Amino acid sequence: MRSPGRPSVTSPPLRGEIVAAFGRHFLVKTADESTLTCVLRGKKSGAACGDWVEIYQTASEQGVIERILPRSALLYRSDLSREKLIAANATQVIIVVAPVPSFSEELINRCLVAAESQQLSVLIVLNKTDLLGPSKVALNGLSLYRELDYTLLPISARNDVKPLLPYLEDNLSVLVGQSGMGKSTIINALVPDAERATGDISPTLDAGRHTTTHARLYHLDRNARIIDSPGIQQFGLQHLSIEAIAWGFREFRPYIGKCKFNNCRHSGEPGCALANAMRESEVSVRRIDLYHKLIASLNTNRIPSSSSRTKIQ
């Protein structure tokens, strides 16, 4: 797709929602249900699936994004070199795990911290419960998150996805998880023509064989929408401060600000309220260890100030 020319100043802008994102190409659905393949104007900051945008139409099925409208939330991950936008304006993060292949608990906690930083609700879905023995082991391992008041939903998407439906109502949910956890099975059960719709986008966005690596938004009904995001193996949190990461562990919050030293990182400093809570078994040793892994992975030279807890544009 060639870069579009500047439209006539007399043509009115259209408002639409990004329903598919692949690199610098976006599929935007407008109010009349038509879709335009769009690119961002100039060097504007990145857009994400779920963004509401103002666009100018430049051809029958093409347009240019002139403005990204204010967001209520932005879920994204970051490493030392770049940021990867996942979804905009979501209200719920659905973390999909399965007993086979094995899932990463560190990745679950990274997703939880990212969701908490944007004040998004969280649902943890244990898929493939038809694998009875492995599922029992996985459920035992995930019971900690139920104790932390996260909702844990066991399902077998290949057999019955209906238990998930009530959690989707009145939400824009985004599915996240490692490859192989069954996210595609869930989407195909919820949206029977999802594979065809995804195939249609391939030539439109010139995505070729990488089609499965883009985010896609589906309307299930007028009150339920869901974004399928690419499978991830890492979830960098370089954009969050140490304070924000600690806040992302919800059970830590009663102890934050009660340490002997204001700059306590909860990593063995004397008078640490969180360490005392762990010794009193009020906080899980497992979660403390996971927190230490997260902050150890940060490059402290790139950590923003404690006031930079979100990135809403």
Swiss-Prot record:
Binding site for GTP: 127-130, 177-185
One example GO MF annotation: GTP binding
Co-factor binding comment: Binds 1 zinc ion per subunit.
Gene Ontology CC: cytoplasm
Domain CP-type G: 82-235
EC number from the UniProt entry: 3.6.1.-
Top-rank taxon: Bacteria
Biological function: One of several proteins that assist in the late maturation steps of the functional core of the 30S ribosomal subunit. Helps release RbfA from mature subunits. May play a role in the assembly of ribosomal proteins into the subunit. Circularly permuted GTPase that catalyzes slow GTP hydrolysis, GTPase activity is stimulated by the 30S ribosomal subunit.
Family: Belongs to the TRAFAC class YlqF/YawG GTPase family. RsgA subfamily.
Keyword Cytoplasm: yes
Protein name, per record: Small ribosomal subunit biogenesis GTPase RsgA
Subunit structure: Monomer. Associates with 30S ribosomal subunit, binds 16S rRNA.
Cofactor: Zn(2+)
Short name of any one Pfam family annotated for the protein: RsgA_GTPase
Chain positions recorded as Zn(2+) binding sites: 259, 264, 266, 272
Subcellular location: Cytoplasm
GO biological process: ribosomal small subunit biogenesis
Keywords: Cytoplasm, GTP-binding, Hydrolase, Metal-binding, Nucleotide-binding, Ribosome biogenesis, RNA-binding, rRNA-binding, Zinc
Residue ranges crossing the lipid bilayer per the database entry: none
